[in-house]
């Protein structure tokens, strides 16, 4: 069965629109080894809502919070705008739409908050929230995944299962999905951005996987 990486719905949407190129990981409290481990080099992007908050998304992408609701299907209708204000304000829907997958083009670890700030053009969270990801589990470095994202030809709706709610990075989807589709950025656009990201992380990290520039 295909593997998916769990990420906020607004982040999944940004990745699928080419507005975000990286994700930052420390790992959930239910990770098998208690911290993040990159076990897969390509995976589908699974949207989550229950920890997503509007005050942790930068001002320029606030409108995307409402549009990100399209990634879920609620039997009782979409949640209200006020639900975005607190963590847990939006429950995970009955079903979610899988519309993109990603391959890892680079994997770095960093511990310098200045590097997190320098990477801010490549994510939609507030810089303060990104730094909080660094500070959590302080003894462990922050994993920076450079992702080449692809939109699948037609979004696929999958049923949300109880085991998907465990606080961990990965899940196994219970239906087959195609690793097909179009990259959200052209080869040239992605290569230029990847070179900039690699340059930012070079002095602050040791690359765990060399970027694959295509």
Question: What residue ranges belong to the model's regions?
Answer:
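Structured alpha/beta reader/binder surfaces that contact nucleic acids or chromatin modification marks
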Residues: 1-214
């Amino acid at each position: 069965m295909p593997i998916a990486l769990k990420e906020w719905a607004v982040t999944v949407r940004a990745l699928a629109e080419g507005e975000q190129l990286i994700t930052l990981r420390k790992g959930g409290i239910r990770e098998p080894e208690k911290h993040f481990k990159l076990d897969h080099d390509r995976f589908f992007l699974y949207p989550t809502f229950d920890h997503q908050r509007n005050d942790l998304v930068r001002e320029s992408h606030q409108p995307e919070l409402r549009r990100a609701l399209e990634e879920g299907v609620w039997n009782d209708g979409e949640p209200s705008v006020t639900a975005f204000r607190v963590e847990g304000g939006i429950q995970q829907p009955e079903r979610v739409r899988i519309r993109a997958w990603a391959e890892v083009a680079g994997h770095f670890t960093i511990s310098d908050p200045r590097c997190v700030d320098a990477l801010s053009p490549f994510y939609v969270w507030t810089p303060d929230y990104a730094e909080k990801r660094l500070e959590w589990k302080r003894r462990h470095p922050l994993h920076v995944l450079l992702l080449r994202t692809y939109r699948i030809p037609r979004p696929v709706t999958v049923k949300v299962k109880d085991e998907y709610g465990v606080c961990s990075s990965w899940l196994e989807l219970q239906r087959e999905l195609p690793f097909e589709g179009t990259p959200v950025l052209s080869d040239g656009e992605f290569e230029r951005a990847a070179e900039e990201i690699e340059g930012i992380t070079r002095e602050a990290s040791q690359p765990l996987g060399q970027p694959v520039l295509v």
